[in-house]
Regions:
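Glycine- and small/polar-enriched repetitive beta-structure motifs of secreted/surface proteins
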Residues: 1-180, 184-191, 197-204, 208-212, ...
Length: 221
């Protein structure tokens, strides 16, 4: 284990703490930055937690927090009188409040509070299992499944009707366009994204049908 910095602690085999008051606990845990905290409480290969950045926090298994105040899970610091290297001392230990597995938070104050989530961007937030938040201030919401819809009395069933999780590029008040999207496949089983030119083509086709109908029937048909 390696500890470098004022009041830095590295507790656990192959753990590393670098920075003023940086704390790492658990096998292979890494904390780098002022008051960075990395806590692994798992066994076997479910270890190796990384927190890099001032006040960054990571806990659980294989979770990563990169950035000032980034969080993959949440921790608290508690004062504890323990025996470390045969010397009784009052030390600060880490206690997990929320552990997450395989979570990644990248960006200042980015936060992931559920397993397998990804938050990328300043203050990006994930609160859903396997959720993805892309861009500053983006936040995930609960996934919504849409298996079918009824339009003018006719039911249409959709491919990919069950949503496993969700990807967000904004939040309730901040919206973003997604540009440079290639044309997706259009068929009954397609789950591709559709771009604007394809919708324009559909609108033109519908308009041509309406125009042909009017020409055949005449009047205001």
């Amino acid at each position: 284990s390696v500890a470098a910095g004022n009041a830095a602690w590295a507790l656990g085999e192959r753990s590393t703490a670098i920075g003023n008051n940086a704390h790492s606990e658990g096998y292979g845990s890494i904390a780098m930055g002022r008051e960075a905290s990395a806590l692994s409480t798992q066994d076997g290969d479910k270890k190796n937690v990384v927190a890099i950045g001032d006040d960054a926090q990571a806990t659980g298994s294989r979770s990563i927090a990169l950035g000032v105040s980034a969080q993959a899970g949440t921790l608290e610091r508690v004062r504890d009188r323990s025996v470390y290297k045969d010397n009784p001392e009052l030390i600060t230990k880490l206690k997990a409040q929320k552990e997450v597995t395989d979570a990644v938070a990248i960006g200042s104050e980015a936060s992931v509070q559920e397993n397998e989530g990804l938050a990328l961007g300043s203050k990006a937030t994930v609160n859903n299992v396997r959720g993805v938040a892309l861009g500053a201030n983006s936040a995930t919401a609960a996934p919504v499944s849409t298996a079918s819809e009824t339009i003018n009395g006719l039911q249409y069933n959709y491919a990919g009707g069950t949503a496993d999780s969700t990807v967000s590029v904004g939040n309730n008040s901040t919206k973003r366009t997604i540009t440079n999207v290639a044309a997706g496949r259009v068929n009954a089983q397609s789950t591709d994204a559709i771009n604007g030119s394809q919708l324009y083509g559909v609108a033109n086709a519908v308009g041509n049908v309406a125009k042909s109908t009017k020409n055949i029937l005449g009047g205001n048909a």
